[in-house]
Regions:
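Short, surface-exposed ligand-recognition loops at beta-strand->loop->(often short) alpha-helix junctions
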Residues: 41-44, 75-76, 108-115, 181-182, ...
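An N-terminus-focused feature that recognizes amino-terminal "leader" regions
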Residues: 51-86, 100-107
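C-terminal segment of N-terminal export signals and the immediately downstream linker at the start
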Residues: 6-7, 26-52
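Extended intrinsically disordered, low-complexity coil regions enriched in Ser, Thr, Gly, Ala
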Residues: 87, 113-138, 253-276
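Structural motif
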Residues: 96-106, 236-246, 308-315
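Hydrophobic, ordered structural segments
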Residues: 60, 111-133, 139-181, 185, ...
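Intrinsic, low-complexity N-terminal interaction/targeting segments
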Residues: 79-96, 214-237
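N-terminal secretory signal peptides
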Residues: 1-7, 18-21
């Protein structure tokens, strides 16, 4: 080939050589931009906006993240004992309204083994999709299972009726327990220092929530943290400043092994590793844990596991 090409000829050849590279990258970039544009966003709501849902469920919830109406269903009828510690568990449903006029509900039901299949049948009949079935605890009595679900519709009250029907398959009390804030002997200030986060006293249980830093989506719908995309840590006081800790870490696939290793190095038992949803992006996995020890020592071990995740304290 003659190397003595005129400038215009050189420009044509350069453009021809670069074009395949650009052609290979532009669609991916365009697809990512299109996906961002197609995200369906939650809309801000207040508790008054959810009055029909509250009427159906027979109780009020609270608005979290400015958009998620979260309703809790305590199983105060069902004290659960594990390793000598009595826990009072519960279910929840989180409703989120979107700018396309649809409402999404996500949540989980805490059910006994005899209640499990009737609850699953009720979810199916009500048009709610089952996304996970598993345990959250090691050996415990009575045997408990957790069923995660989600669904969406234009009418939030219809979703609430489906949730209520599933709850009716259990002996979950129809009214919430009376509010209480029993005193605790945990050194909560030192625990918060170790975790570098503020906790909340929830009926004597000191709880911490950590949000994922990424934007989590499901079929294009942006999922606020309060829909369940969080790490939750609960400290149950057992006396002498000792605590039973349980909860779950929300992790991407690349974080799982480091989190599990950190938990075990800290003497914390790994209970379960599983999903809660089916189609969220990025894909999340949840590791449930359990331990009993001095509360501050446990907090230090949990901090090491938190450091392996891309999370930040809620609030």
């Amino acid at each position: 080939m003659d190397a003595r090409l005129n400038p215009s000829r050189r420009r044509l050849l350069t453009a021809a050589a670069v074009a395949p590279v650009l052609a290979g990258t532009a669609p991916g970039t365009a697809a990512a931009a299109a996906a961002r544009r197609q995200r369906v966003l939650p809309v801000p709501t207040a508790e008054a906006d959810w009055s029909r849902v509250a009427d159906v469920l027979g109780r009020s919830g609270t608005v979290e993240d400015g958009a998620v109406y979260r309703v809790r269903f305590a199983r105060q009828d069902l004290p659960v004992t594990t390793y000598g510690v009595t826990l009072f568990l519960g279910s929840y449903a989180a409703f989120t309204r979107y700018d396309d006029g649809h409402t999404l509900v996500m949540g989980s039901l805490a059910v006994t083994e005899p209640e499990l299949q009737p609850a699953i049948d009720a979810l199916n009949t009500g048009g709610l999709e089952l996304s996970a079935v598993h345990k959250h605890l090691l050996a415990h009595e009575p045997a408990m299972w957790w069923t995660h679900f989600h669904g969406h519709a234009e009418d939030p009250a219809a979703l609430a009726r489906s949730v209520k029907a599933a709850l009716a398959a259990t002996t979950t009390p129809s009214t919430p327990p009376a509010a209480s804030q029993p005193r605790t002997d945990l050194d909560t200030a030192a625990i918060e220092h170790e975790l570098n986060a503020r906790g909340v006293n929830d009926s004597g249980i000191h709880r911490f929530t950590f949000n994922r830093r990424e934007t989590i989506t499901d079929h294009g719908r942006v999922l606020p943290p309060a829909t369940g995309m969080t790490t939750l840590i609960s400290f149950y006081p057992v006396g002498a400043r000792r605590a039973a800790v349980n909860g779950d870490f929300a992790m991407t696939a690349g974080e799982v092994q480091n989190v599990l290793a950190a938990l075990r190095r800290g003497g914390i038992n790994v209970v379960e590793l599983h999903n809660h949803g089916l189609t969220e992006e990025p894909r999340l996995f949840f590791a449930h844990f359990w331990a009993i020890d001095d509360g501050v020592i446990l907090a230090r071990a949990l901090r090491a596991a938190l450091d392996a995740t891309n999370t930040t304290p809620a609030g």
